[in-house]
């Protein structure tokens, strides 16, 4: 029987249980966990064998990683655009791509893409845990029909897919994990969206993290409909409570703070992420514009990388350079006291109070700094270092 305290919410056990003895339940925070019905369970062990919290089949640690920038699709994604370059060629060759995207109700779900139009929504960053309900059945049907599959997800999700299907469909299944600090819940995200709608007096129809509308590492944009008219709103991360709290690591799912996949050895054939800090090693690469980090972890990963190399500018670096500014290449984020406080506020005072508690306490000061020219920031930081 699975250890529900370690559950990461992938729902793979729900899919594999032959006696339908496992339900997927969510708590007040919106965190999903498997729940075993003892009356139906015969202790066959199927769930234990595929659980990514208990079984992690990791690849050899690569010595080098690549910094990559797409020649034509840098703005399609949140970083350098290499995911689109790989995935679009995978589709061109008759394959199917699976990744996360918001639906029309701003629910983050894993979706299936067989066209370039379906692929585009999968490219942007989404800082919450995607729903995998129904995805495994679709994956199984595609694999059984002989299709090649490229699945991208958080390491725990990638591991679930690998544990379920890699033995039987090894040659057809290509997996990418991404450098994941942790994921928040749909419930907390929804609460922040509802408060934003109340403040603006309209209905938000789409949302984009890491919007490239400003020269900043983290900014957002969304479309809101008011009185039949649509308007695009953009801002910095600290102006949207969910984004601000995510970057403070205070709203992750509980299992994220002890994630077994936050290390150099990775579960995917390739690992994707942002190459934060690369400007310190190559001044021609500005990570605020987006620079992809890609690590090849297997022979199949090399095939994926080869699909995109002719359409990207690529630079090779030692692994430790990427790990220096990406903690998820070293260890999970520590559990913050603030998270416990936020859960208590939600339990006692409700969603509106939670969003207020998640908000940046000094937006004006942050706005002043964000809008300051880079040269002034550098002078200030240099002077501060000598005080």
Language-model regions, residue ranges each:
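Long, compositionally biased charged/polar accessory segments in the mid-to-C-terminal portions
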Residues: 93-96, 197, 202-387
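Flanking helices and flexible, charged tails adjoining ferredoxin-like Fe-S electron-transfer domains
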Residues: 39-145, 320-334, 338, 344-357
């Amino acid at each position: 029987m699975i250890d529900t305290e370690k559950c990461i919410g992938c729902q793979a056990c729900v899919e594999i249980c032959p006696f339908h003895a496992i339900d997927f339940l969510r708590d007040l925070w919106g965190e999903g966990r498997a729940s075993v019905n003892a009356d139906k369970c015969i202790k066959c062990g199927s769930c234990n064998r595929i659980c990514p919290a208990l079984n992690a089949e990791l690849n050899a640690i690569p010595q080098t990683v690549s910094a990559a920038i797409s020649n034509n699709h840098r703005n399609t994604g949140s970083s350098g655009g290499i995911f689109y370059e790989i995935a679009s060629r995978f589709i061109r060759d008759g394959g199917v791509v699976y990744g996360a995207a918001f639906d029309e109700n701003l629910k983050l779900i894993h979706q299936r893409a067989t066209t370039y139009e379906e692929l585009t929504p999968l490219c942007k960053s989404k800082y919450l845990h995607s729903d995998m309900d129904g995805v495994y059945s679709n994956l199984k049907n595609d694999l059984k029909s002989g299709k090649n599959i490229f699945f991208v997800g958080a390491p725990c999700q990638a591991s679930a897919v690998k544990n379920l299907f890699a033995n039987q469909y090894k040659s057809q299944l290509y997996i990418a994990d991404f450098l994941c600090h942790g994921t928040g819940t749909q419930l907390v995200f929804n609460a922040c969206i509802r408060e934003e709608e109340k403040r603006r007096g309209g209905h938000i129809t789409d949302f984009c993290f890491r919007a490239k509308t400003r020269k900043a590492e983290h900014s957002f944009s969304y479309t809101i409909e008011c009185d039949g008219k649509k308007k695009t709103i953009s801002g910095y991360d600290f102006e949207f409570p969910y984004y601000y709290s995510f970057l403070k690591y205070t709203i992750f799912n509980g299992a994220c703070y002890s994630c077994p996949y936050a290390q150099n050895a990775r579960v995917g054939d390739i690992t994707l992420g942002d190459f934060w800090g690369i400007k310190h090693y190559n001044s021609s690469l500005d990570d605020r514009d987006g620079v992809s980090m890609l690590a090849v972890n297997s022979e199949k990963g090399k095939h994926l990388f080869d699909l995109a190399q002719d359409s990207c500018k690529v630079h090779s670096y030692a692994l430790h350079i990427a790990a220096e500014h990406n903690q998820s290449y070293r260890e999970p984020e520590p559990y913050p006291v603030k998270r416990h406080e936020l859960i208590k506020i939600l339990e006692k005072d409700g969603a509106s109070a939670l969003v207020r508690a998640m908000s940046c306490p000094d937006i004006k000061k942050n706005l002043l700094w964000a809008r300051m020219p880079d040269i002034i920031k550098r002078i200030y930081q240099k002077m501060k270092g000598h005080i």
